[in-house]
Amino acid sequence: MHLQNTHNTMESNAAMDAASPASRDVRQFHDLITCRLCRGYMIDPTTVDYCYHTYCRSCILKHLLRAVYCPECKASGGKEINELNLKSDDTLRSLIYKLVPGLYQRECKELADFKEQHDLVDEQTTDEPEFFTTTELISLSLEYHPAMLHQCGPGEVPPTIYLQCAAGLPVELLKRFLCSKYNIETDNGLVEVEVTYKDEVLPTNFTLMDVAYCYNWSRESPMAFCYRILLYDNEQTKNDENNLSRINQDIEPEHSVRRSKSAKSVTFAEDLESEIDSGSPRSKVRCKTPPKVSPSSKNKRLTSSKREAEPESPVSNFKSLRSNDMRYSDYAVSKVKSEPEQEQFLLPREREQQPLEANTNIVVSIPPSQLRKSYVDAEDFELKTANRKGVGHLPKLKIELNSMKSKLSMPLSAGPRLEDTSCSLSCSAQQLDLETYAKNIGLKPIEQPLQQSASNPDSKYSPNASPMSSCSSSTNGSSSSLGTADASTSTSTSSSHRKRKKKHSKEPKDANGKRKKLHAEISSQTDGKMKVKITAKPNHKLDFKRSHSLASGELDLQKLKLDSTSTSEALNRTLGEEARSINSLVVGGAPTPPPTPTAEPEQQQQQQQQQQQPQQQQQQQQQQQQQQQFVVLPKIKDLTLPTSPPLPPSLFKAYTPSTTPTAPHTVAGGKPKQQQQQMPQQPQAVLQQSLAKTNPAKPPLSSNNNRKPNSGHFAVPQAPTHRNMYHMQRYQSTPSSIASAANKMPKRSMSLDESHPAKQARLSQAQAMASSYAAKLHMQTSNQAKSQAAAFLPNPQMRSYGLPDLGSKPTLPMLCPASSSSQVTITPRPRATPSIYSFSEPNIHVPALEIVRLPVNKQSAGGKGLTMPPLSPPATSSARLMGPPAALPKHAGHGHGAAKRSCQMPTMPMPLPLPLPMPMTTIPAIVKSPPLSVALSGQRNNKGNSSNSNAYRTSPPALINLRNTAAPQHSFPSKSSPKVEANSKKSPPAAGCQGKTNGTAALDKSKTSLREFRPAVQSAVTATATTSVTTAAGAGAGAGTGTGTALAKDADILDLSANPGRSNNDAKLAPNSPPAGNNNNNNNNNNNNNNNNNNNNNNSTSNSLEAALNKIKQNISANSNGGPSTTSGSNSNGTTNGDDLQNLHMLSESATAREKISIKAASSGNGSGSTSSSSAKPKNANALVRPQNASVRSIPNPSALAFRNQPAAASTAASISKPLTVRAEEKPKVSTSNPGSLSPTNTSSSSSSSSSGSSGCSAATSPRAMTKKPTTIDQVAANLNIRAEAKAAALAEEAPPVLSSNAAKSPELAKTTTAVALRPEPKETPITVSAASTLLTIPSAVSSVSAVPETMAKPPVQIANAPVASSA
């Protein structure tokens, strides 16, 4: 049936197309619609479901009374059938009734007669007839198309015509009727009348009955037909359109053609309006004189046709085609109105020549303004007949746009483009098109276009004047400030050298918000590769000679340097352009380094510098533009990048594609910038001051900071936003931005993409942190409030982008030289960076204790320079460890942003021992993690100090609570630890409950909430610490926690890094070995998993942070979590454990970092400590690490995931803080539950947060998590970001440097924790990371907290609560 129907329809259409509406005889379908039993038309066709043969229902039923086989299948042995096998075919029934005129009515009449005869008149359904007869009268109305009415004057609107016609009336007769009404000769080829229904042009062979069937006319109201009169320049246009419509009739019988016509008229409604102003379309139509009618409709058509005709040449103009620019869209408006008819007539002729394309696409291609003119009243005027909008019409649209160019007054910017186009069009339209297209794309240098550009060099290359600029104007518009002089020079160069095409590399706006124009000359002469030459003011002739290599670019740079006398802006622009072109080459994979060898040695160095400097220069240009633009050139001249040269190839390859360009900036770019900045510093004291603030050691960031701190750019409130903006700008400004890779990456906050560069950046961050402390001292002396705020804000921002240098820049000169040179040095610096935190002062108070504790821990003394307030650096790491997870949601990217924010937030928490509760409240989200980290670091440093556990307890519970799900696993009983792990994975509430069960002895209080847990915290601290140690041992990932083995409290904190599975095993073992205050005992219990971890923990309670920082730096440099990364050998084990936590943090910070760290942690065991945990739970750890790496890779934004997990982690940290208070007696229980919870903290689930603390802590954490409801990642990120920014602003002034150290540490933590966290769920890893990083940070905090009474543990807990709320 369906096949038959389709066939019929197709045949009918074909017949209609071929001839008149009645061209198809019903007899052609007889075989399809007649019954084989009665040989008549099938009435109520019924199909046999077996063979699909169709018969009249009455016929087949009668047949079944005699036989049980299908009449057509019986001979072939068909199946037996019965009434159940019969299916009514309503579709075929409808087709038959529609095909056979009068059949339906005859059957209805017969049925009625039959019923009357047999008295079967049951509720006769007097439904309206479903089918029409050719003689049935249909009411209809003819109305002038509303889209054309605007052209008519108030008294010229034609009246609506109402008719009643037979259903068989063809549309052709309606058209003839209209022609007679308006005295239009039907054979007049210049005038056409179109009849539309529902904005679809009807084919002339359609009948009213066809319209009723096709549009489901319901007989409720007259058919509302619309008509319009179209005027053509010549008959050819009409014929072409008619032919097109006929061609399209096969698909949609004339709908497409008339749509095209309507589209034309509609498109040119404005033109018609101008004509109609002279006379209404009807008056024209009414006038027998076709010209009068034609003026209105023809003008419309002519406009469209003219547009079409001219567009052919313009079609070559790629820009006009691509852009819906008003310049192109309104090209013909003014002239059309002034000379509507003439132009329109011309256009119609051209259009007639190209009627098909023009008809279809005019509506679409013409800008809305033009469409309004044509169909002001009805956008729907674009008839539903989309057929006319054919792909073929698109070119005509383009042509129309170009044609319009000549007519319309173009903006100045558009003018040059049009002029170029006109010149090229006059020469060769297609060449111009191709050339323009190539120019726009920037693929090939076009000699002729270059000539044209030479003729109009300035206008063409003015930001908006050139066709190329139109394409790149959006990107280049901001760079216009840089490139006015460059534009002219490059223009002249391009004109002189046709082979070279000057390309404005697209760059994001600079910090100042202006886009720099980089003129890259593409050398077509290059043998196999296109080389981009940065055009500066240097002679392009020389460059042209050297166009094959970048040597010309180098010479240009040298010339620019020599030409320092030229405007500083011009120099900066040139440098920026060169850097960008080099970056683009790097991004594109073009052999930028190869050209370097061709250049002279100095040139090579300069090229390397330039390559490294592209970022540096971009930053410096921005910075120095603010400071002194000429400084950049001296830097470039004198600048030698001894350390950076090794970086450029790898960095550029890795850097250019990755969004981690900040890392290259920091590492490769940073050193060159340092040198450059140092060079300027000597000549300029002012620059030295600003650069000193920015820390030359971290030039890339410092350069950005130089801009910002020097100008006071980073207001505390602004810091997060501007940081992001600057990083984004940098990336955008780099060629990668052209590729849009960098642009995309910033969305992630660079965290994920920083895999290698990020680590390097983090190294820089560690350096920056160290330097930031010195810088903070520096800045305090110079501009404490302002520079601190600037340094602080930049640091978080830099970190978020993997550029910690900004924040720590100020101190980098003092501390960073060694830091940048050696990671170990950096670690002590970050240690000293406590002032970096906004809460550095409280840290300073605690630091004395912390310093003492760190020395107590040989690792801490050796690992990190306690010379600087050690507490702050641990706080920094703690803030970073804790903070980054909290901050991660906002900085989906690398943990640097998170670290920065965490630093910002933790900045407050760092003083947490005393003032932290308030700061935490202020910065709840990020502050959570810092307190936990601070407390953890302090506890690690002072394994035996309850104050450390208090400090830990102060902050970590909040973070732990964030990932409360893991909290239950902290429960002390080893029996419940497995359940705790499971629960921690399940949900914070469950975790909390299990935590209660596990920590029944001393942590039952924590069941209810953190508050309940607080009273037990002191007593539980010992147990928690022991448990932590056990957990760390059991987890093997709880390096930081395990580090506190000497004290159970420290162990608890370290446990956060332990994997849940490990934690359970370790927890079981740990309970066996009493807290004993010995990590070794716990290790003995968990010797397989935790022996190394415990040793590591013992070594690195305080050193864990130091080692973490060292490792972070080493990992950044070596991209490995190996113990050697830790600064101190003794710290290596404990540090690795702490590093595991840090690595977890790193995991949350960046997917790339996670992958590398996890792989390294799995392979190398995260150094001695990580190896212990990895080897302790080796196979699980490694296996989990690899899956996590895979998952991290699969996760687009691991940082975001980390943040999603972060809230729970923060809450977990809070709960952990309390567990720190758990007494040693409870150690076995705590360790039992902690291992499980630690594992979750690492990655399994919220239980990881519990792992940092004792089970009581987990209980507290779970209550917080339950109370708090894990928020969505977006919510947490938003809250954390807002609070972090607010707090960062406040805290930045106090201790921005600490943030740097935290940032430095946190990457390590992330890395170390990565190995641990990798083992559990990848999604959990981010959570674990936050908790672990919080714990790691805590050692520093603990150092500061150590002096703080246990009562301080409660305030930190409160702070943790505030952070939890903020995360929620």
UniProtKB/Swiss-Prot annotation:
Q: Which PROSITE patterns match?
A: ZF_RING_1, ZF_RING_2
Asked if the keyword ATP-binding belongs to this entry, the reply reads no
User: Where on this chain are zinc fingers (RING-type) annotated?
Assistant: 35-74
This entry's Gene Ontology molecular function terms read: DNA binding; promoter-specific chromatin binding; zinc ion binding
Q: Where's it mainly located?
A: nucleus
Give start-end positions of Polar residues composition bias: 449-461, 936-953, 962-977
What is the official name of this protein in its record?
Protein suppressor 2 of zeste
What is the species of this protein?
Answer: Drosophila melanogaster (Fruit fly)
